């Protein structure tokens, strides 16, 4: 077969495997298919995800299930104000050998895993958050002056409660930008909640089964980068990201009046990756404008902010992103 035909065959095989993974995940994490898609998107793209939702919506259950299905060694850290960097990274202890000699031995922290759940990440101090920041970006940690490799794959799925703000330390823009997507976990509808009730209060609960190995996940991440992206989609991504920069020439008056700062180049990179994953999860061989529209809010909402006047008026950042993206897609379709 020719190389394009080989690529098509590989993508189709991966799409089938992803559908198996989704089916296994949704046996334990019922409903909320969009949440499952976005977390899988983060893993396929080799990135990290920030899950925002109220307690009791199944975020921890989702991460545990993902760990099983994707064949990843997972750890969980409950972030608190007194959590120190050493509690995450690990530390060196002084050991005494049988002959009386002493030497330092490194005890690795919970960050040395393949899928880390950082629960209530905004409750940790900025000092502890910065330790996680290095790990997320560089996939290495520095302990006692020595760099230690975390290896691949390494993914952080962090959770945050949008309501409780007392005793929290808001994540700085630099750290928010390290998350590939923001996943809003909302209340289930009535039928989904009924299904959850019946599935989780009986004698037996459904079990998730491993579908991927970590080697297969790494191969999928490489394959995703080989998926072709049309020129019109590339231009739409650039138009969308630049449309939210208030100082950019030609942006709308609404953006100038409401946006404090817009997304940087990393947002365009994130869109370029996530539209491919979104297309793959929906069984298509290449992304289109609809993928850009679907990924606009998860990719951009944590990479920009409304100004004080807009927040005082009660303006919605999500509405701004979705309406602007929809307008650009309509313009592109009419061209």
Predicted features, each with a name:
Residues 40-81:
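Walker A/P-loop
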Residues 7-15, 28, 168, 182-254, ...:
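Conserved C-terminal "switch" segment of AAA+ ATPases
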Residues 95-100, 124, 128, 136-227, ...:
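Canonical AAA+ ATPase core
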Residues 1-5, 249-335:
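C-terminal engagement/docking regions of AAA+ P-loop ATPases
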Residues 10-54, 242:
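Pre-Walker A (pre-P-loop) alpha-helix and adjacent loop at the N terminus of AAA/AAA+ ATPase modules
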Residues 38-41, 95-117:
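Conserved alpha-helical scaffold flanking the Walker A/P-loop in AAA+ ATPase domains
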Residues 54, 88, 159:
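P-loop (Walker A) phosphate-binding loop of NTP-binding proteins
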Residues 119-120, 131:
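Walker B catalytic acidic pair
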């Amino acid at each position: 077969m020719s190389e394009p035909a080989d690529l098509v065959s590989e993508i189709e095989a991966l799409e089938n495997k992803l559908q198996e993974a989704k089916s296994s995940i949704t046996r334990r994490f019922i409903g909320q298919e969009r949440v499952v898609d976005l977390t899988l998107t983060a893993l396929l793209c080799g990135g990290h995800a920030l899950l925002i939702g109220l307690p009791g919506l199944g975020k921890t259950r989702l991460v545990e299930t993902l760990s099983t299905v994707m064949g990843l060694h997972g750890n969980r850290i409950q972030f608190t104000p007194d959590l120190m960097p050493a509690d995450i990274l690990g530390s060196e202890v002084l050991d005494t050998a049988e002959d009386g000699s002493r030497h330092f031995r490194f005890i690795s922290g919970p960050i040395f895993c393949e899928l880390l759940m950082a629960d209530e990440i905004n409750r940790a101090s900025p000092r502890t958050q910065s330790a996680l920041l290095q790990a997320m970006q560089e996939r290495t940690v520095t302990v006692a002056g020595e760099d230690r490799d975390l290896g691949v794959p390494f993914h952080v799925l962090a959770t945050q409660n949008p309501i409780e703000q007392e005793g929290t330390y808001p994540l700085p823009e630099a750290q928010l930008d390290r998350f590939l997507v923001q996943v809003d976990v909302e209340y289930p509808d009535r039928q989904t909640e009924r299904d959850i009730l019946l599935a989780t209060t009986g004698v037996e609960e459904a079990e998730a089964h491993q579908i991927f190995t970590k080697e297969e996940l790494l191969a999928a991440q490489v394959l995703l980068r080989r998926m072709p992206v049309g020129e019109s989609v590339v231009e739409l991504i650039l138009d969308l990201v630049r449309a939210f920069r208030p100082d950019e020439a030609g942006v709308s008056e609404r953006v100038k009046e409401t946006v404090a700062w817009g997304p940087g180049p990393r947002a365009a990179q994130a869109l370029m990756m996530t539209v491919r994953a979104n297309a793959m999860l929906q069984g298509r061989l290449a992304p289109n404008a609809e993928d850009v529209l679907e990924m606009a809010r998860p990719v951009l909402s944590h990479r920009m902010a409304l100004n004080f006047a807009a927040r005082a008026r009660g303006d919605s950042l999500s509405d701004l992103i979705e309406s602007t993206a929809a307008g650009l897609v309509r313009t592109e379709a009419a061209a």
